[in-house]
Amino acid sequence: EGERAAHAPMAMRQRAARFAEGNLAFERALHPALDHTVPPPAKTATFTWHIAPADGHFLGRVYSDGSRLDGPTPLLARNGWAFVVLDDDDHIIASASGVPPDWVEDIPGTEAWALTQAAMHALPLCTSFVDCDPCVKAVHAGPELSCADNKPLARVHRLMHLTLDDTPRQAVIWMPAHLRPGQCGAVTRGDGFLLTEPDISGNAEADKLAKRAVELHRVPLRTRQAIKAHDELVTANAMWIARASLIANQQCE
């Protein structure tokens, strides 16, 4: 934007803003696009127990999380989810992870999928801690609002509410993410209580497992590097053409 402000008139920048999104390589035919070199994300969802409860169900405090790596473009970004369950003695009694189906395309959707997977195995009286505020708000808003046809996450929210069933909304609590041990003293959760060290460790373990799950269908490093270099080259060429065109248009005939 700084380059545009220095070299292009305001009227031209306003016109260009309408077309700023997209793939320059494809839309401007500057270079052959490399999209075909990127393997697609996993089509179907996966579920893997790391610590499996004896009968497939658990009772405890649930920490669910979703992870998205290599974004922000959908071409490279891949999602993973996980949950960890602690008992009253703060021991991990259950944990699982996996990837969501390919129609779940963002972090709030992945977070909702993670909570759904945990709820499928949770016994009554479990409390869930989620570090995604939109996901928690969708739970508290209820199915009528969060599953409306005009909501982009209606499909995954509908599954989430069906699985939570009669779980009290106050049993799904927001908590801040990515804190370190020792930062609990002045930080509160969504229920007004102070964050605890087990809260931080439970969330951190879920985050680690979710990131590990992304590796199941992550785009290979060399492909990511090639796409990055290609995008930088195309952007540089597009900027050069824009500057040359501006200078040419300012010349007197």
Residue ranges of predicted features:
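RNase H-like, metal-dependent ribonuclease domains
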Residues: 1-253
